Amino acid sequence: MQCAAVQKPLTNQWQTLIDTIYRQYQIYHQSGGKEQVVFNTQTGQAAGRSLTLLRKLTEPLALSASGRMLDVGCGNGALLAAMGNLYPQWRLTGTEPNDQHRQAIESLPGVEAFHTGEAHQTPGQFDLVTLIHVLEHIPHPAVFLRSLSAKLQPAGQLLIEVPDHQRNPFDLLIADHSTHFSPAVLRRVIRQAGLQVKLLERTLIPKELTAAAVLPVQSLPHHDDLTSLSPADALQDVTRHINWLRRFADEARAHARHDPVGVFGTSIAGTWLGATLGDGVAYFVDEDTSRHERPFMGKPVLAPTDRAARQAKVILALPHWLATQVATRLQDTGIEWILPPAPESV
């Protein structure tokens, strides 16, 4: 697509890999099906991602007390459950490519329907259509968004949540993410879909972009800030991120060369670093208590407060800016933290 987006090469080999991944995929495997939590970077207080997002969007979205919502790619129903909790008078619908979680979703309070198949074929129109970590899986995101615009009521809103690859280079490592978004690219994709950007934030959920879009009949200020966005800029951006990932891997190997290390995190970045270091990993450390119940990559998962977590130096598998915040917040645990390399200056 002509929007200077970073995308995977959409080859037959890539599609075969993706088909294999989706056949074997288990949602939120490490936490036993529980949605990942979001931690307050200052206090460490944890809350579910969906509930956190909806609470932070209360004022920007200004939703009515009642309405209809369509959650596209609803997974096992985390966002639907949070919506039913905060807005009990709303009628909720979910869609998925298959009916693996049909029973769980249909049992949620407020859910009136669950559909499989193409999202744009879902009957009816809605006051809110949500795409939470869906758009990055779509090879042609503008076309996909345009197909969903017909599902919006005239005053309806489309809510999008995607990874921010500029703030989180680890997003580039995820095989089934076909499109990698920056704020400028997401804004352009929304406009190419014939929609207007009502909201675009990168601070509501760490490492993620949050956008709200509406039909163009609504009067909103136009922010034409895309004149400098070019394929050359995108290539330079992604090259810098890949070089950073390589430096991180090299530094981590050096730390683990003589003595095993701990790895903070059991999500994508932790998985990548664990695979990079192999037997150089002694254990993983994670603040999410739901991830302590089972080993990860054959190694125990410890809480930062566990005495055993102090036995080795622990590498923070996070972007540098977030790793510094976490290390500061957890400095009283007694763990010797190893920060990732600082990013190259632009």
Predicted regions and their residues:
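Conserved N-terminal segment of class I S-adenosyl-L-methionine
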Residues: 1-124, 128, 132, 145, ...
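Short catalytic micro-motifs in class I SAM-dependent methyltransferases
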Residues: 132-134, 139
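Conserved S-adenosyl-L-methionine
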Residues: 195-206
